UniProtKB/Swiss-Prot annotation:
The keyword Lipoprotein does not apply. The keyword Ion transport does not apply. It catalyses: tRNA(Tyr) + L-tyrosine + ATP = L-tyrosyl-tRNA(Tyr) + AMP + diphosphate + H(+). The lineage of its organism: Archaea, Methanobacteriati, Methanobacteriota, Stenosarchaea group, Methanomicrobia. A motif ('HIGH' region) lies at residues 38-46. One of its GO terms (biological process) is tyrosyl-tRNA aminoacylation. This is Tyrosine--tRNA ligase. It is found in: Cytoplasm. Homodimer. One of its GO terms (molecular function) is ATP binding. It comes from Methanosarcina barkeri (strain Fusaro / DSM 804). A motif ('KMSKS' region) lies at residues 211-215.
Length: 317
């Protein structure tokens, strides 16, 4: 897989591809970042962007991970001390998932976001962003609020300034970050900063085919036990022929195939024996043709996801 294909793998959108190609021609080692609000357990939705960072590292990018403890504090996710502890947990998880510890720059928001230069830039940006625009940006990333605090309106402004102050060329995030990233693209140049390129990954559905929610237990956390993962995937939605909103297929596409050149679906000889696939497309076609059963996919997905997450469990013990 060539450099550009690796960058574009499993990406929903690049804003813009032309700017990306120009950057690759101009810089040998471009800089990209993702910001993570340390507010709870890491789940497979977060791992999707970690996978993209790993792709970018393989493509020669310098990677920064922002552990956004101040953002979490402003979003009322705990005291600064509490969210800093969660940030440390996040960092251990990301390294165990495959980010190169020596080549990843981990930055805590509190290391620079309380400085005068940073805050002055946030205030400058606040003069050109309407309250409605800030609120829409927050709502888009799943933080819809009936009665938001001023701190939560500052959140998207800080996220835009993060891109500038970290000196990165590319902002990576889920497609739910798009409105905040567009805010940055439209406004940072007016403050004297470069316009960032944005890479957006899809948002994974929960295991039941609906939006992920902690109350539904419809997602996989990176520290789930092997037994919990087998149990959750056994109950997961995997309707024969449904390739659009199928969480089991999504696990193969976004998490398993990027890490394994060959996938073996294990099944008894009386049901045809093991099947080997070398690409996601090959496996999806077999699923549509009903030559592989949903339960066989579920069992194999559980096996591979457990292998991927085993280093995380060892680190967290």
């Amino acid at each position: 897989m060539d450099r550009l294909d690796l960058i574009k793998r499993n990406v929903q959108e690049i804003v813009t591809e032309g700017e990306l190609e120009e950057l690759l021609n101009k810089k040998k080692a471009p800089r990209a970042y993702v910001g993570y609000e340390p507010s709870g357990k890491i789940h497979m939705g977060h791992v999707l962007t970690v996978n993209k960072l790993i792709d970018l590292q393989k493509a020669g990018f310098e990677i920064t991970v922002l552990l956004a403890d101040v953002h979490a504090y402003l979003n009322r996710k705990g005291t600064l001390e509490e969210v800093r502890k969660i940030a440390d947990y996040n960092k251990r998880c990301f390294i165990a998932l495959g980010l190169d510890k020596e080549k990843t720059n981990f930055v805590y928001g509190s290391d620079y976001q309380l400085g005068a230069e940073y805050m002055l830039n946030v205030l400058k940006l606040s003069r050109s962003v309407t309250l409605n625009r800030a609120r829409r940006s927050m709502d888009e990333v799943g933080r819809a609020m009936d009665d938001p605090t001023v701190s939560q309106m500052v959140y998207p402004l800080m996220q835009a300034i993060d891109i500038a102050m970290l000196g990165v060329d590319i902002a990576v995030g889920g497609i739910d970050q798009r409105k905040i990233h567009m805010l940055a693209r439209e406004n940072l140049k007016n403050l004297g900063f470069e316009t960032p390129i944005c890479i957006h990954t899809p948002i994974l559905l929960g295991l039941d085919g609906t939006k992920m929610a902690s109350s539904k237990e419809n997602f996989i956390s990176v520290d789930d036990t092997e037994e919990e993962i087998y149990r959750k995937l056994k109950k997961a939605y995997c309707k024969i022929g449904d390739t659009e909103e199928n969480p089991i297929l999504a696990l193969f596409r976004y998490h398993i195939f990027p890490r394994y050149e060959t996938i073996v679906i294990e099944r008894p000889e009386k049901f045809g024996g093991n099947i080997t696939y070398t690409s996601y497309e090959e496996m999806e076609n077999a699923f549509v043709a009903e030559s592989v059963h949903p339960m066989d996919l579920k069992n194999s997905a559980a096996k591979y996801i457990n292998e991927i997450l085993d280093p995380v469990r060892k680190v967290l013990l």
